[in-house]
Amino acid sequence: MNINELPFETEQMIASLRIWVEAESPSFNATAVNKVIDLAAYDLASMGASIERVPGRFGFGDILRATLDNSTGENTKAGVVICCHADTVHPLGSLHTMPYRREGNKLFGAGVLSCKSGLFICLEAVRQLIHSNIQMHLPVTFLIVPDKEAGCPSSREFIEASVRHAKYALVPEPAAADGGVVLGRSAVLRFELDVKVDTVHELKSSDHTGVKSPIYEMARQVIDIEEMSTADCNFSVGTIQSGQWANFAEKCLAEVISEAKTTAAVKESTEKMLALNSPNPDSGLHVNRSVKLPLWESDEHCKNLYDELVKAGEELSLELNHSTAGGGSLGNISGAMGIATLDGLGARGLCNQLPGACRSRAEYLEIDSLPERGKLMAALLARLN
């Protein structure tokens, strides 16, 4: 059967995707994330996959690894790993303000573009191949993690073990700005900041001691940190926490993310942040390195995999460019390990035109990209050998 003839029915895909989007799954709620893991495990088991489910660590949800082998048997050792995540940045209750809804060619909803549609598209592609008796040349493993949006602190070692012997890693993050795919991503570095003062700061109308609150000190540091950004290395403060009461603050905490485009920029980012450490262990700013997604620079293996995608796209009359991106994905891990990796295989949508929008209330996907990307994934899986 021609891949173009596979029955990717748009209306059915819209109806089925609703189930995934309405299973809200913020990274730090293991119970909620595990509901998405449940959905994936059921679908994959119904396709005949062998299921491995590993409890998460550090309070995160479970990790799912499921292997399907309807391949021709030409290579049973090194196969394809489809790297997905079940978690989103949206807290429980976000569907009240970001409901699943359709407007013209747009589907809205919390997590609809990142990450639910990417996982759904891959599952649907494999399902269609199996039901149509189209054999793949390689076994396919789905790896679904619960903590990507947090930087993969729980699943990192499991990801590395799962892709180490793979021939290809496919990552269904949203498509690039022009609808193309991603070959290479910036490193993502996280830092935890802690500001302490020698004296607990209690605001009083008669206070003329000159002691500044930890909030004041953190605010000053935030401005300095974000102004360290360059073309190759940016810094962004995402969370700040402080204050027990309106007039009492003992310390102030913050988290910084830095994206670095080159090896030199990774080194520069780390050095700049650690240089901010106070020499006094009891006061001032203290910086700790947190989780990190490594720099992924495309190599010959990735480009050869992209060539296979181009040929798959030609079967569907699709032109597919490639570019590098920030944001971080599981592709950072597989790509940095030297595995042939292809990212940005998910749907088209708002964050393709406006980076960061896929984590905002404006998030949407373009409906016509659901069957398009489903067929593209199916065509690619049928080609790889």
Which sequence ranges carry the predicted segments?
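Short beta-strand segments
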Residues: 82-84, 143-145, 170-173, 194-196, ...
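Glycine/charged-rich beta-loop-alpha catalytic/anionic-binding loops adjacent to active sites
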Residues: 98-111, 314-316, 358-359
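Short, conserved micro-motifs enriched in small and acidic residues
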Residues: 107-120, 149, 212-215, 364-371
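Acidic/histidine-rich catalytic neighborhood of metal-dependent amide-processing enzymes
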Residues: 115-188, 385
